């Protein structure tokens, strides 16, 4: 999830001296389930509110703090480290920042995932890429679109096929929701 993305960013040589704000929207997660309820507009609204928080200077040091701190610096870039949030809200976030006249880069994880998917291919090789993701990410079609576009631009693979499988409960399992994890399971779920 987002913490593994942050860990990779922090280890990048050119970014070692930067300060980071990690924001996990625990109140509205998992984002991957919003499309199951046909509620992607609410998902986009949550992501925009997340961005507004990151743009502001106020924050609370703890859950029981009575007054906000006001010393948070303006962010230089925003990484949306959730596939479903990237799929449904990235373009809206970019437009929001542009309309606000803010020169802040926004990066989504899907393009990075599409780039990484080609790591095991030799130039000109045919191949298939399997995407296992939340229902929302799969329904968005964002990964096949990004993979095909990347291949079209780079011409790395001769013929590429993309297969997707939505994982029921995958978002919850990633976040270690006790309802979604059965450590003693010996077969797939009956509703899968």
Residue ranges and their predicted role:
Residues 1-192:
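Non-catalytic structural scaffold of enzyme domains
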């Amino acid at each position: 999830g987002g913490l593994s993305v942050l860990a990779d960013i922090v280890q990048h040589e050119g970014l070692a001296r930067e300060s980071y704000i990690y924001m996990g929207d625990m109140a509205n997660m998992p984002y991957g389930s919003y499309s199951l309820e046909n509620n992607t507009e609410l998902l986009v609204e949550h992501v925009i509110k997340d961005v507004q928080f990151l743009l502001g200077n106020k924050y609370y040091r703890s859950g029981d703090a009575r007054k906000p701190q006001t010393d948070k610096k303006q962010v230089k870039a925003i990484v949306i480290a959730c596939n479903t949030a990237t799929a449904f809200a990235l373009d809206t976030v970019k437009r929001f920042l542009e309309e606000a006249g803010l020169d802040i880069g926004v990066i989504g994880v899907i393009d990075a995932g599409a780039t990484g998917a080609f790591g095991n291919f030799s130039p000109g090789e045919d191949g298939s890429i399997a995407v296992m993701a939340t229902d929302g990410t799969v329904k968005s079609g964002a990964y096949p679109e990004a993979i095909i576009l990347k291949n079209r631009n780079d011409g790395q693979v001769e013929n590429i096929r993309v297969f997707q499988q939505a994982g029921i409960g995958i978002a919850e399992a990633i976040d270690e929701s006790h309802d979604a994890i059965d450590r003693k399971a010996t077969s797939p779920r009956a509703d899968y």
